[in-house]
Amino acid sequence: MSTRGLGNRLATWFAALAAIALLLPLAGCLPTPRPASSTTPSATASKGPILVVASVNQWGTLAQEIGGDDVKVTTILNSTNVDAHDFEPKTSDIAEIQKAQVVVTNGAGYDSWASKSIAKSTVSVSAASTVGAISGDNPHLWFSKDARKAMATELADTFSKILPSKKKSFDKRLKTWQSEESDLEDAMAAFAKKHRNTTYAATEAVAYYLMSDMKLKDVTPQGYLQSVTSGGEAAPADLQEFQELLESDKAKLLVDNPQESSDSAALLKKTATANKVPVIEITEQMPSDQHTLTGWISSLVETMTKQVAAAQTDEKDSSNDTSDGTATDANTQDASPSPSSASQSASDPSSSTSPSSAQ
């Protein structure tokens, strides 16, 4: 699964759009990026509301925000207790997909059960197609700010073509959403500025894009990551390396996906807790107490901001306590050591403070 490769393609995609925008005044008509939707929306024009089916609630809530009262959204997968990768749709789910005017999917192999059920006359809007993701890339695209922005725009355009009389309404909702998303990006930028070079590790790469947008550094052992990405259990040596990472305070956060539980993940969470490393639970599907995609991710950013700040405060307090203890011990010694003893201390490595005690 290539996470960094897709990140580079996302940046390239948006750069290409900017370049096209600059060149349009100079050239009459230039080719546009590959559309994210299939079937011509105008061919299915209606008086509304538009019947929309989303494979997962992350994209379903976004479709509802952009569409408002002018769409009727049905979401197939709403529960955090179900793994979308292995989800088996019921006959009624397939029927919903096939009667929809617009089907919203994630793509990149995440919800192929929905993609392969779409009727030829149905307009398909895929997050993966929108940003150029392919099977094998990290499929958790809703955690990417670039993917969210691209999908919001694509949905507004698609709905406007099907229901042109409501285009102003769709555009207005899109602008409202963009304002909220901008606030989220500001919060992520503030975190990145205040907590530079903060590290994290993950039991599963569910939130890779989110952590990347927040400028956190992924220090998850590669051997472990490759094992879980391929669907296997981590080798004992890789698991031990991960535990040592947490025990040595090299990861300031541990991200866990409770929808992908395993004995290895349970052990790593236990190790993190024992070493006072904050554990952040991030599910794939939106929890039932969240109602919008941006709102959910904003709450995750807020939680991580508080957890990191609290951990840094504890670390600082611990460091101060250690320093105070060292000062007290020093005061019991001769306040004026002889030059010879000072020289001996400087040349003797064993007399210096260890990295662990200095932290």
Q: How does the language model describe each region?
A:
Residues 2-18, 25-359:
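Extracytoplasmic metal-acquisition and chelation regions
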